Design a protein with these regions (language model features):
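An N-terminal boundary/leader segment
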Residues: 1-48, 274-276, 451-452
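Acyltransferase
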Residues: 18-23, 52, 259-284, 314-320, ...
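Short helix-loop capping/hinge segments that flank enzyme active sites or metal/cofactor-binding pockets
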Residues: 67-87, 240-245, 301-353, 411-421
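Acidic/His- and Gly-rich active-site-bordering loop/insert found
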Residues: 47, 57-128
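Glycine-rich, small-residue loops and helix-cap segments
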Residues: 25, 69, 75, 109, ...
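Short glycine/serine-rich loop segments
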Residues: 99-218, 403, 408-416, 420-423
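Flexible, glycine/charged-enriched surface loops at secondary-structure junctions
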Residues: 38, 224-231, 274-287
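A short helix-breaking turn/cap at a secondary-structure junction
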Residues: 182-266, 447-452
Length: 452
C-alpha cells in the first residue's frame, strides 16, 4: 500500500513534491483501475492544480497541515463541489449538488487533494457496484465502502473516507487489507447524511498515522455531528502502548467463521498473552457473559433500525421506478413496522450500550475479528437471518454490534487467510479513540502477522 506521512519530509526538503506523489498515484490508477474499478469519477485537472498549490506551500515552508498534498478518495455518498454525487444509484446519475459536505470542506481546508469519488453500493446499502477486490478480482471488496477500501488496498491512494451504519467500513477494510477507524458515534461530522441514528464517518488508510491524521483534520475543521462532543485527542496519534487487559468477544459472528480464520485468531490471542496482555473471556466474568448475550441479534437489529429510519427516503426513491429490488425488499420490511417496533429496537440498543459501559472497569478495550474470514467470491450470498434478502458484499456479523453500540473501533490487517487479508478489530469505550490508536500501534509493532 502507499503511505503519505513518512514521505512528507521530502516535500519540505525539496527532494519530492505533492505533484510528483500524485502522479505516482495516477500511474497506479492507470495500471490497476481497469480491473479493480474503484472509482466513479476522477477530477484530474483539479487534483493536479491542488497538488501544485500544495507544492508552493511546502516550498515556502507553510503547509496547511500534515496532510497538505495528500491524495484522497471520497465515497460517492458525500457531496463534492466539483464532481457529481450519484449515491450508487441511477436515480442520481450525473447529479451536481454544487457544494462540499462538511468532511470534504474540512479536508480541502487542510490541503487535501480530493482526487475523485469512490464506488459505493446503492445508497450505501446492499446492492453491489462494479468494484473488485484488489487482492483477487474474483472476490468482493466488501460494501458499502467498496471503492475506498479497494483504492487504498491497491495502492492507488494513501487514504480515503466513508461512512458506516452496519459494517460498510470495517468489513471492506478487512477484506482489502486496510487500516481503518470507525470513530465514536458522532465524533466526525456526517454533513448532509444525518438521517440515520448510527451513522459513523470514518477513515481508511495505508498506515495508522495516515488514518489518524485524516480523522483529526476532519474533526478539527468540521467538528462533530450536532450535539456530540467530537473526536478527542491531539493531532499526533498516541504513542504505542500495551493494552494490559482486553476482553475477547465472539459475537454472533463466531459461528459464521471458517476454521482457518478461527485458528489464526486464537493463535494471535496466544501471541498477546505471551506479551503479557491479560485476556478476559465470557466464561471469566458474568458482565462479559451478559454483554455477549445482549448483543446477540445485532445484525437484524441494525436492519430494523436503519430501514425504518430510511423508510421515507426509500418511498421517494421507489416512486422514480429506478430503485433496485434489493432496496424495495428493505422498504417492504420497513412498511411492516410500527413506531412501537422502532421504539423497542432503540430500547434494545440502549440496553446494549449500558452493558458496554459496565465492562469499563474490567479492561482497556475489546478485541475480535473484523470479518468472519477473508473476502467471499463476487456474487456470494450471505444469509441475513431474514428470508426476504441476503447480503451480497460479505457478512456484517462482526460489525453490526459495534455500529449499534457507537463505540470506536480500528481494524488491523494482521491475518492472512488463504493468501487474502483479514482484519483484527480493536474496540474501546466511547471517546477512547486516541488511546485506541496507541494500542493498535503497539500491536502492529509487536505482533507477527499470522498466515493460515
Amino acid at each position: 500500500m502507499r503511505t503519505f506521512l513518512d514521505v512528507r519530509d521530502s516535500f519540505l526538503e525539496g527532494s519530492d513534491s505533492p505533484r510528483d506523489y500524485l502522479e505516482r498515484c495516477l500511474e497506479c490508477i492507470d495500471s490497476r483501475e481497469p480491473q479493480v474499478k474503484a472509482w466513479v469519477v476522477l477530477n484530474l485537472e483539479n487534483a493536479r492544480q491542488a497538488a501544485d498549490e500544495s507544492g508552493k506551500r511546502y516550498r515556502q515552508g507553510k503547509p496547511l497541515s500534515v496532510i497538505d498534498g495528500m491524495p484522497l478518495g471520497s465515497k460517492d455518498v458525500l457531496q463534492t463541489l466539483d464532481m457529481p454525487t450519484e449515491l450508487g444509484s441511477p436515480i442520481f446519475k450525473g447529479r451536481e449538488t454544487n457544494m462540499d459536505t462538511a468532511s470534504v470542506n474540512a479536508l480541502r481546508l487542510a490541503g487535501g487533494v480530493i482526487l475523485g469519488k469512490t464506488v459505493t453500493t446503492e445508497f450505501a446499502f446492499v446492492k453491489p457496484g462494479p468494484t473488485t477486490n484488489p487482492f483477487d478480482p474474483q472476490a468482493t471488496p466488501g460494501g458499502s465502502s467498496s471503492g475506498t477500501s479497494a483504492a487504498v488496498g491497491a495502492g492507488m491512494i494513501p487514504a480515503g473516507w466513508r461512512n458506516q451504519v452496519v459494517g460498510s467500513g470495517i468489513r471492506p477494510a478487512s477484506y482489502c487489507g486496510n487500516f481503518a477507524i470507525k470513530p465514536t458515534i458522532g465524533a466526525l461530522h456526517n454533513g448532509e447524511g444525518l438521517s440515520l441514528s448510527q451513522l459513523h464517518l470514518g477513515v481508511h488508510a495505508a498506515s495508522l498515522p495516515d488514518m489518524w491524521a485524516v480523522a483529526y483534520q476532519i474533526a478539527n475543521r468540521a467538528g462533530s455531528d450536532p450535539g456530540y462532543p467530537g473526536l478527542y485527542g491531539p493531532e499526533k496519534m498516541c504513542d504505542p502502548q500495551i493494552p494490559r487487559r482486553l476482553i475477547v468477544l465472539k459475537t454472533e459472528g463466531w459461528d459464521d467463521c471458517d476454521e482457518k480464520t478461527k485458528d489464526a485468531f486464537l493463535e494471535l490471542l496466544e501471541s498477546l498473552k505471551a506479551q503479557g496482555v491479560k485476556l478476559i473471556h465470557r466464561s471469566d466474568d458474568k458482565s462479559v457473559e451478559h454483554f455477549e448475550t445482549s448483543i446477540l441479534g445485532s445484525v437484524i437489529l441494525c436492519r430494523i433500525i436503519c430501514s425504518y429510519e430510511m423508510r421515507w427516503l426509500l418511498r421517494n426513491y421507489k416512486a422514480t421506478g429506478l430503485l433496485s429490488e434489493d432496496l424495495k425488499q428493505w422498504l417492504d420490511l420497513a412498511e411492516e413496522m410500527s413506531l412501537q417496533d422502532y421504539r423497542e429496537a432503540l430500547q434494545k440498543r440502549d440496553e446494549m450500550r449500558k452493558a458496554l459501559q459496565a465492562l469499563s472497569p474490567l479492561a482497556e478495550g475489546l478485541i475480535t475479528l473484523s470479518s468472519p474470514g477473508p473476502a467471499p467470491s463476487l456474487g456470494h450470498l450471505v444469509d441475513s437471518g431474514e428470508p426476504e434478502f441476503a447480503y451480497k458484499t460479505g457478512n456484517p456479523s462482526f460489525n453490526a454490534a459495534t455500529s449499534a453500540l457507537g463505540l470506536p473501533c480500528i481494524t488491523l490487517p494482521l491475518l492472512g487467510i488463504d493468501r487474502m487479508p483479514t482484519g483484527i478489530q480493536l474496540m474501546g469505550q466511547h471517546h477512547t479513540d486516541w488511546n485506541l490508536t496507541g494500542d493498535a500501534s503497539w500491536m502492529m509493532q509487536t505482533l507477527k502477522p499470522i498466515s493460515a
